[in-house]
Amino acid sequence: IVRSEPDARVLILNIELCTLHFQETGDLEQMLSFLIFADGCAAALVTGEADGVALDGFRTLLIPETRDLITWTIRESGFDMVLSGGVPNAIQTGLHAHAADIVGGAPARAIDLWAVHPGGRTVLDAVERAFGLDEEALAASRAVLRDYGNMSSATVMFVLDELLRAGARGAKGCAMSFGPGLSAEIMAFRSA
């Protein structure tokens, strides 16, 4: 929209009410998945102006043989979520296999800002291993997970905000989030 209408303003909202999905359960894996989630809300204003984040490209990665690792099923009692312990390994394997494409053929160290959705500590560890990153590369993601939890789609926006407050203009970035499928949504960007 803003490319065809330079004066346009597009408001993007991420509103997640994860606590609505809590259910009474004695299943430890289910309880642990509830414990990392939190409610959250984020907003971004997309304009044609050269300020904030310049969007350089988008990519979706569907990781094969992972369909049942993250699922949402609507039941009479509400949403039933499955969050398998196999998610981190699948993310590491899938990202590693496509690492060169994800970072545009450059080495991972050429990316200055990593805005990775902190689905959990082990997910962040898996991303670090997939790209050979040092622990500091995902410090903003770890801080958001520690301070706010996993707010589903809003979480990566919190990470972007943290990075942009501290980042230098022109820094190259890679943002990514994970979800059912198992899928990874990836955005190349520059701080402007």
Question: Where do the PLM segments sit?
Answer:
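Claisen-condensing/thiolase-fold acyl-transfer catalytic domains that form or cleave C-C bonds
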Residues: 1-6, 92, 108, 112-192
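Active-site-adjacent elements of ketosynthase-type condensing enzymes
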Residues: 9-32, 59-76, 121-129, 150-158
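Condensing-enzyme catalytic core mediating Claisen C-C bond formation in acyl metabolism
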Residues: 22-93, 97, 101, 178, ...
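Residues at the starts of beta-strands that form the adenosine-phosphate
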Residues: 9, 42, 172
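Secondary-structure boundary elements
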Residues: 1-9, 46-53
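Conserved beta-strand/loop scaffold segments within soluble protein domains that form the structured core
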Residues: 3-5, 13, 36
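Short glycine/serine/threonine-rich phosphate/pyrophosphate-binding segments
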Residues: 18-20, 55, 182-185
